[in-house]
């Protein structure tokens, strides 16, 4: 089941999950691979990619899994670069193979493409995607790799992709999403009532020269993590900082999870 409004296409920090799965599928990256984020600042073709804690000195050397747990932009980019850096079109091809198809996407076929564009794409920029499209992808992960068309009422299920990635890598990304909630920055999404899994993100949707910047913060996940029944995406706009997908959208996600779980418990008691 899905609980979501269609919204509008936008940048999405939730892309980190998609990118990590694509990197794993390449066979060139493992969750145990180590990447050096240094002091949380990475310069690519003259453009600066930062992790959220760059002002505190960054994360240094961390694994791909640890990078996912702390929503590291640099780890995401370096994992994707290791997998597809020699041919960025292979990254786009992998996204298509996994049926991740944004409303708009800036690709290596476009004039002026650069390594910096590759980096921004890997973390959710240079594309416009509907929240419902992102939810559909996360739901496929919950569904052990089977992607289905979202339905809001009971009806026949339409399969989009029978298996978006190998079962081994689906298992890996499921584990990473669970750890994001239990051990990473997603702890505010942690429910005492049921096991959950998910990922969060933040994207700037206003121009750099605007005095007060606008952000979209997101959390997408599913529950129960060990036998999923529901997938949910929370997307919120926020003017100015602080703006955190893990804190703001993650808290709302947990409230929704607890509400549904309580209602199901009451329904079971009545029966």
What are these language model-derived features?
Residues 88, 249-250:
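Amphipathic alpha-helical segments in well-structured domains
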Residues 238-248:
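A short acidic/glycine-rich loop-to-helix N-cap element
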Residues 158, 250-271:
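Short, gly/Ser/Thr-rich active-site loops of penicillin-recognizing serine hydrolases
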Residues 1-12, 18-238, 266:
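Beta-lactam-recognizing serine transpeptidase/beta-lactamase-like catalytic domain environment
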């Amino acid at each position: 089941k899905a609980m979501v409004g269609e919204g509008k296409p936008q940048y999405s920090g939730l892309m980190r999950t998609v990118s990590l799965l694509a990197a794993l599928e390449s066979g060139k990256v493992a969750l145990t691979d180590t990447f050096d984020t240094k002091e949380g600042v990475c310069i690519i073709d003259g453009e600066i990619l930062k992790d959220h804690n760059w002002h505190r000195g960054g994360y240094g050397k961390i694994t791909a899994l640890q990078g996912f747990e702390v929503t590291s932009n640099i780890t995401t980019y370096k994992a994707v670069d290791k997998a597809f850096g020699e041919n960025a079109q292979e990254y786009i091809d992998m996204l298509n193979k996994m049926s991740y198809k944004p409303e708009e996407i800036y690709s290596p076929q476009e004039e002026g493409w650069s390594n910096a564009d590759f980096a921004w794409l890997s973390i959710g920029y240079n594309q416009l995607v509907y929240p419902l499209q992102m939810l559909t992808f996360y739901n496929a992960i919950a569904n052990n790799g089977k992607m289905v068309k979202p339905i809001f009422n009971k009806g026949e299920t339409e399969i989009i992709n029978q298996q978006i990635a190998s079962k081994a890598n689906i298992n890996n990304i499921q584990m990473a999403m669970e750890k994001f909630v239990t051990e990473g920055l997603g702890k505010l999404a942690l429910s005492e009532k049921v096991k959950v899994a998910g990922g969060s993100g933040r994207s700037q949707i206003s121009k750099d020269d605007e005095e007060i910047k606008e952000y979209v913060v997101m959390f997408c996940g599913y529950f129960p993590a060990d036998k999923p029944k529901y997938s949910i995406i929370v997307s919120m706009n926020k003017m100015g900082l602080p703006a955190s997908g893990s804190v703001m959208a993650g808290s709302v996600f947990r409230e929704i999870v607890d509400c549904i779980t309580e209602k199901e418990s009451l329904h079971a008691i009545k029966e």
